């Protein structure tokens, strides 16, 4: 009997159980000298937390970075911590609500010559003699972190990235219209201190708020502004664990047309296998 008990204890100590883990970043106000307009990305955090909890995420496993907490360094550290804690078969959800910007592609993997980037709290809108884009979080850098995460969770795990930002869609912004995320001004580099990464095959889903050339408008509810993509996901929270990503993107587009009543086409990137699965 003691022998069986010992074997049982050894076996049970090696078992790991899949968890649902999330990182939610919301920026409404940027550093005073950054040049960025205030938006309401920080309002999205509570919606995302409620949405995730409705889909089995424990609040203890939902890390958040809000406004001045969401510096480039803190975001990178949070991604690293998420990777360190991730286990095989885990479900990973990463959500960014804030400004986005196109930045010069330094490793020449983009056809148009520009990387997409998330704009952390401390990233200026323009280059200068002392700033060369090192605090813009490019898609190459994010993909590097996601590749590490993908290795940790394995083929049965899930990784979903939501970008409620806009990288190039404000070229049609009307004078005085501030309810839009992102900028049409590209961040042009002649030199950079950023590391270069080799493009990796993507084993994750990336859902963004709109196509290039479209505006990502915020949605106003009871006098409070939210990201339109975030709010659409919140309204569809009961279907996030049951509908495939392909089915979900159609539902999201329908919701966006109702919410903002302007052309806004959400984009879904990832492998075909990921698109056929649920996002959570």
Regions found by a protein language model. Name each.
Residues 14-280:
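Cysteine endopeptidase catalytic domains of the caspase/legumain-like
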Residues 4-12:
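Sec-dependent N-terminal signal peptides
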């Amino acid at each position: 009997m003691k022998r069986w008990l010992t074997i049982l204890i050894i076996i049970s100590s090696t078992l790991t159980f899949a968890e649902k883990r999330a990182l939610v970043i919301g920026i409404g106000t940027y550093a005073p000298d950054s040049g960025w307009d205030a938006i309401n990305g920080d309002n999205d955090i509570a919606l995302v937390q409620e949405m995730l909890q409705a889909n089995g995420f424990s609040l203890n496993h939902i890390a958040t970075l809000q406004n001045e907490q969401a510096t480039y360094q803190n975001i990178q550290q949070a991604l690293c911590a998420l990777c360190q804690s991730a286990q095989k078969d885990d479900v990973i959800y990463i959500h960014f609500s804030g400004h986005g910007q196109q930045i010069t592609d330094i490793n020449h993997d983009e056809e148009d010559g520009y990387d997409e980037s998330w704009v952390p709290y401390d990233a200026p809108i323009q280059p200068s003699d002392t700033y060369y884009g090192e605090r813009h979080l490019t898609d190459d850098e994010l993909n590097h972190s996601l590749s590490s995460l993908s290795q940790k969770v394995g083929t049965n795990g899930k990784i979903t990235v939501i970008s409620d930002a806009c990288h190039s869609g404000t070229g049609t912004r009307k004078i005085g219209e501030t309810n839009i995320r992102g900028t049409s001004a590209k961040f042009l580099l002649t030199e950079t201190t950023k590391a270069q990464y080799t493009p990796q095959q993507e084993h994750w889903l990336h859902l963004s708020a709109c196509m290039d050339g479209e505006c990502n408008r915020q949605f106003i509810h009871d006098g409070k502004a939210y990201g339109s993509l975030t709010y659409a996901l919140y309204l569809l929270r009961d279907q996030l664990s049951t509908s495939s990503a392909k089915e979900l993107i159609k539902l999201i587009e329908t919701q966006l047309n109702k919410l903002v009543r302007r052309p806004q086409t959400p984009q879904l990137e990832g492998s075909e296998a990921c698109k056929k699965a649920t996002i959570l």
